[in-house]
Curated annotation (Swiss-Prot):
Renumbered residue ranges of the record's region Disordered: 224-364
Entry keyword annotation includes ATP-binding: no
Keywords: Sporulation
Membrane-spanning residues: none
The protein, known as: Spore coat protein B
GO biological process: sporulation resulting in formation of a cellular spore
Bias kind Low complexity: ranges: 275-288, 296-315, 338-356
Length: 380
């Protein structure tokens, strides 16, 4: 470059720098449109970047990509709370202040990515993301950077296989003969096998398509197909869920088995108890019936004893009556005979017989027998 042209560029840079300083602490709009367009307070102007205090965060723009900065004269008095701002001499040093923090590269578009900054080379920065794992960004193509709320999922992960190379060319050499993804999206995005060529150029081979690329024009590169890291993570989560489901199912089945065993035991014990209670009730009923039978037998025996005693007593009474009647009848038979015999022997025998003819009829043998029969029948 000629001295005149260098002087022209230096003069333009000085004038542009002075122009930016004149708008410091004013409300401006960076970019007039597109995903990178943001409105806020211009808080810092550095050699190759500016700091814009937006509504919720501070955005650091690399000056070589800023196409326009417009002052908002209508809202020049609007106050925006200023957060703590990083202070660095240049954009590369600014990125170095954000190592191991959650950041966002670019505010929108296909090359916008959020993740944890894990490494910084001379001309690239390595960002650990959820979707693509570690992505290597060419610093020359980063339009803006801002702090982002930490993603717990990313914070808990330890990135594996981070290429800690000095520059982007060494990163490309490490990724040769591997499947890589060039750029995050848009018409320039491509996937394929990276093949090394002479003169610092590389070739991407995908099926029948062969493309020659130069690392300087690559915005970002990552190992493997795009989204493979997220798919692998989802697969691991699904496997984990399946294992948890299996464990829970096995626990439920073992629990149901133990509950069935306990229910069987309880049923068995209830059957034993019922059988025992049945036996006890049967034994009680049998004892009761035996007691009743004993009582009834005792009662019957007592009744039979009473009846036998009553019968025997009645028989004995009958016998006694019969014997008494018989004795009385014998005595009565004998008495008239004896009386007759005595009367016959006495001197007044004939006269007495004549005088007491009626008594002779009353105390005859037949009269006595009839009298006994009458009284016997009447009594029994």
């Amino acid at each position: 470059m000629s001295k005149r042209r260098m002087k022209y560029h230096s003069n333009n840079e000085i004038s542009y720098y002075n122009f930016l300083h004149s708008m410091k602490d004013k409300i401006v709009t960076v970019y007039r449109g597109g995903p990178e367009s943001k409105k806020g307070k211009l808080t810092a102007v550095k050699s190759d970047y500016i700091a814009l205090q937006a509504e919720k965060k501070i955005i650091y723009y690399q000056l070589e990509h800023v196409k326009s900065i417009t002052e908002d004269t209508n809202n020049s008095t609007t106050t925006i709370e200023t957060e703590e701002m990083l202070d660095a001499d240049d954009f590369h040093s600014l990125i170095g202040h954000l190592i191991n923090q959650s950041v966002q590269f670019n505010q929108g578009g296909p090359e916008s990515k959020k993740g944890r900054l894990v490494w910084l080379g001379d001309d690239y920065a390595a960002l650990n993301t959820n979707e693509d794992g570690v992505v290597y960004f060419n610093i020359h193509h980063i339009k803006s950077i801002s702090k982002h709320e930490p993603d717990l999922k990313i914070e808990e992960q330890t990135p594996v296989g981070v290429l800690e190379a000095d520059d982007l060319s060494e990163v490309f050499k490490s990724l040769t003969h591997k499947w890589v993804s060039i750029n995050r999206g848009g018409p320039e995005a491509i996937e394929g096998i990276l093949v090394d060529n002479a003169d610092g150029h590389y070739t991407i081979v995908k099926n029948q398509e062969v493309l020659r690329i130069y690392p300087f024009h690559i915005k970002s590169i990552s190992l493997g197909p795009k989204g493979s890291y997220k798919k692998e993570d989802q697969k691991n989560e699904q496997n984990q869920e399946d294992n948890n489901d299996k464990d829970s199912n096995s626990f439920i089945s073992s629990k149901s088995y133990s509950s069935s065993k306990s229910s069987k035991r309880s049923l068995k014990s209830s059957d034993d108890q019922s059988s025992k209670s049945g036996r006890s009730s049967r034994s009680k009923s049998s004892s009761k019936s035996s007691k009743r039978s004993l009582k009834s037998s005792d009662y019957q025996s007592s009744k039979s004893g009473r009846s036998s005693r009553s019968k025997s007593s009645s028989k004995s009474s009958k016998r006694s009556l019969k014997s008494s009647d018989y004795q009385s009848s014998k005595s009565s038979k004998r008495s008239p005979r004896s009386s007759d015999y005595q009367s016959s022997r006495s001197p007044g025998y004939s006269s007495s017989i004549k005088s007491s003819g009626k008594q002779k009829e009353d105390y005859s043998y037949e009269t006595i027998v009839r009298t006994i029969d009458y009284h016997w029948k009447r009594k029994f």
